[in-house]
């Protein structure tokens, strides 16, 4: 993501849309919806990082076809510094399966940070 996200713009299960795209081979990632659609069957590896700043916190979920597959927590809730959390999730996908990252059920404070100091990210690749 190229900009900070104010916490007051989040809602439970709101998809994170990563607008800064370095590589999108096959165009499987949709930069409008924030969702990755598997172009074929196989084992895929996904990595995500989320940063909270200045007394903020947020749980985030890696979701496959509406089912939570991984959860992270970036928690700077009791200090005015950064807190970064990341996940690496290996998933067996069928062609057409959809994976995305969304806000979890716990969040508060001022904002999630994504700027020149730290960047929220979502990446992945097909293993087999």
What name fits each language-model region?
Residues 1-128:
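Extracellular jelly-roll beta-sandwich "head" domains, especially the C-terminal globular C1q domain
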